[in-house]
Amino acid sequence: MKDELEIEGYKIEGISIGGQETCIIFPNLSLAFDIGKCPPRAVYQQFLFISHGHLDHIGGLPMYVATRGLLSMKPPTIFVPNAIKDDVQRLFEVHRAMGQSELKHNLVGLDVGEEFYIRKDIKVKAFKTYHVIPSQGYVVYSLKQKLKKEYVGLPGNEIKQLKFSGVEITDTLLSPEIAFTGDTTAAFIVDSTNADVLRAKILVMECTFVDDKATVEHARLYGHTHLAEIVKYAEMFQNRAILLIHFSARYEAHEIREAVSRLPEAFAGRVFTLTEGF
C-alpha cells in the first residue's frame, strides 16, 4: 500500500478497486472503513466499520482479527450493519472451528441512525446508502465543549463555582468530520436524512464508473455511482474535500485522472482520487 494522502489534517491510507478490495484507513483515529483483503496497515487500527457483506469489502475480516491476536494486540471493535451481524458471528464460529483459535473481538451491530462513541470526543453514526444488498455508510463526528454565551467574560473563579454547583456552563458542538459511503447509488445524495454526509469535512465516496464505458443506468442497476451523477448534483456537496474511491478495474490510473480533471468548477481544488493498485 503506497498511497498515503493528507487531506484536511487527516492522514488517509488504503486501497479500493471495485470488485476486488476496499479498505480505507484513518490512522489518526485508529479506524478503518471496510477490510477488503486486510492490507497490513489495517491490522493496527482498533476500530473497523463494515459497510456491507460483499467479499471485496469484508473478505479480510477473519485475517484482521487473527493477525491482531497473533501480535498480542487488544481485541478490535468491529461495526457491521445489524442485518448481517448474525451471519458475521457464524463466520467467526466457522473460522474458530477450522483454525482452533479464539479470534477475540467485540462485534457491534448498528442500524441506520444509530451511533457509537469510540472516544468521549468522537462518535460514529450509521447512515442510509443504496446498494443491491443491505448496506450503510458512516459519519464520524467530533464533539467539543464551548462556554455558553451568557458566561463568556465571567472571572474564572465564578465559572468554576457555577460548574461545581451543577450548572451546565458549556454547549456541545457537534461537527461532521468524515463520511464514508461504501457501495451505493447516487440516491444517497438526495436523501434528506443524509445532510451531514454532504457537509462533512471529508467525504470518502464510491465512484465506480467515470466515463461512457458504462452508463448511469448500468451503475444504478448494480448499486453503484457514476461520475456523471456526481456532476449532476455538484451544488449539493458542501464538503471541503471529496476522496473518490472504488473505481472499476477496467480503468487505468490516467483515465481516472483525466475524467476527474474535467469536473466542473464547483469541485475545483477539493476532489482527490485513490488510485493505489491501478
For each of these PLM feature ranges, what is it?
Residues 33-36, 45-56, 80-81, 179-184, ...:
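Active-site neighborhood of phospho(di)ester-bond hydrolases with catalytic His/Asp-centered motifs
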Residues 36-81, 109:
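Active-site metal-binding motif and surrounding structural segment of the metallo-beta-lactamase
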Residues 60-67, 93, 252-261:
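Metal-dependent catalytic neighborhoods of phosphoester/phosphodiester hydrolases
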Residues 39-44, 116-119, 197, 212-213:
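Short loop/helix-cap segments at secondary-structure boundaries that form the rim of catalytic
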Residues 106-114, 188-278:
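Binuclear metal-ion centers of metallo-dependent hydrolases, dominated by the metallo-beta-lactamase
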Residues 74-76, 83-109, 250-252:
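Active-site neighborhood of divalent metal-dependent phosphoester bond hydrolases
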Residues 1-46, 138-140, 146, 170-181, ...:
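Conserved beta-strand hairpin/beta-sheet module of binuclear metal-dependent hydrolase folds
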Residues 17, 122-198, 202-207, 212:
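Active-site-proximal loop/helix segment associated with metal-binding centers of metalloenzymes
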